[in-house]
Amino acid sequence: MGIFHTVDDNEIKSGENTDIYFVRTSDILALEGKNPVVTVEITAQNLPDEWGVFCGLDDALSLLEGLPVDVYAMPEGSIFYRGEPVIRISGHYRDFAKYETSLLGFICHASGIATSAAIIKACAAQRPVYSFGSRRQHPAISRMIERSAWVGGVDGASSTSAPAGIPLAGTMPHAFVMCFEKPLDAWLAFDRHAPGDVPRVMLCDTYCDEKREALDAAKAGASAVRLDTPSSRKGDMRQILEEVRWELDINGFPDVGIFLSGGLTADDILKYRDIVDAFGVGGSIANAQVIDFSLDIVEIEEKIYSKRGKKSGVKEVYEFDNGDHLLLPKGVTPPEDAKPMIKIFIKDGQILTKPDMQKSRARVLSSIENMI
């Protein structure tokens, strides 16, 4: 056991990290000599919004690799709707029952973050959005947070634990500015010593009026000014942004952008996107509501079954060129222009292909262009 209250990779991969009723279920089934061949599907009956982004498949495949099962799934980054299966597993039930806890945890959390990131990115209307929220969650999962946010469409992440291939983005904390006698001294020091490829985005609300500090920063060579004004401050944020933009423009700095952060929601993005050039979003992405996936048996020994409130039998999901989906029982012929979404990823425990993070993100971005 490590020094922090976290579960290690071996405990997850071995199935030791599970709910106790799966242990008891497997033990009793073994004593009764039962281990039926089943097919299960993972679906969400309720979503935080009208649609979700499927994420976390890479971890799910790593978890199930080596088990005597076949795994089918939507490609990571797929848009899904209520009741659509995102993963399907076939095998002897006891061979994978104890992995349900970790399996659902992987995709519930990652998909929730990716979905929130995608909604916020769609609201931003082509303006850059950066993930600033890893500090709002346990540090042990910061890499997962940044990866999921990236799949959801953000343009960069603040945490140095982000996977390779994700651009790191950040400006400066208020503490940095406060370590100098004046904000100007901090900005000039940043400009002198920060790597040349780091944008000169200067934090402009530490001590003084935002428009005054923004103008001073622009004169000092800022490429953009960042406002992180807390909601407790008196005044209207829209008015503050308009004043800053006005002063920058009228004083000859129309190319100096405005970077906004500080407790932003999707509604805030919609409200300010016409005047803000880039957004840093923390809790609304990192603390996103999880997707409430559940795993249910739909076939036992090739006979269709379901519990109450669920649709029995294996299902296929098809997508049309306009983004519409069609859910059909397996074996029913779809329209000619419908493309199957569910693909095989594991055959007899062997991974056939794993998600590519960049392709997953591209899939999301191509899907959300007209979603908001």
Task: Name each region found by the language model.
Residues 1-94:
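Flexible, solvent-exposed loop/hinge segments and secondary-structure transition points
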Residues 27, 36-42, 128, 198-200, ...:
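Structural beta-strand/beta-sheet cores of well-ordered domains, especially the beta-sheet scaffolds
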Residues 33-37, 64-67, 82, 124-127, ...:
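A generic structural signal for short, non-catalytic loop/turn and secondary-structure boundary residues
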Residues 40, 69, 87, 130, ...:
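A broad, low-specificity signal marking well-ordered, structured residues that form hydrophobic/aromatic
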Residues 48, 78-80, 87-253, 266-267, ...:
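Buried, small/hydrophobic-residue-enriched core segments of structured protein domains
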